[in-house]
UniProtKB/Swiss-Prot annotation:
Species in which this protein is naturally found: Rhodopseudomonas palustris (strain TIE-1)
Pfam family of the protein (one): Trm112p
Any one annotated GO CC term: cytosol
Origin: domain of life: Bacteria
UniProt cross-references to InterPro entries, sorted A to Z: Trm112-like
SUPFAM superfamilies (UniProt xref): Trm112p-like
PANTHER family registered for this protein in UniProt: PROTEIN PREY, MITOCHONDRIAL, ZGC:162634
Identification of the protein by name: UPF0434 protein Rpal_0270
Similarity field: Belongs to the UPF0434 family.
Length: 65
């Protein structure tokens, strides 16, 4: 069951962002609240957040241009 847009959080817990890193580059991630993604600038990948859970699998990530 997916959350509706109005139920999605606009932020990610700061502690979670401090812990999570890109599995490809081991670099930092940025939260994009509009797309519900964690962005790795180094790997040029956007990891989806589904039902409040970050999906940190490179094969599930969207490639950035």
């Amino acid at each position: 069951m997916s959350l509706s847009p109005s139920e999605r959080p606009d932020t990610v817990d700061r502690k979670l962002l401090d812990i999570l890193v890109c599995p490809v580059t081991k670099g930092p991630l940025e939260f994009d609240p509009a797309r519900q993604e964690l962005i790795s600038r180094g790997a040029k990948l956007a990891y989806p957040i589904r039902d409040g859970i970050p999906i940190m699998l490179p094969e599930e990530a969207r490639k950035l241009g």
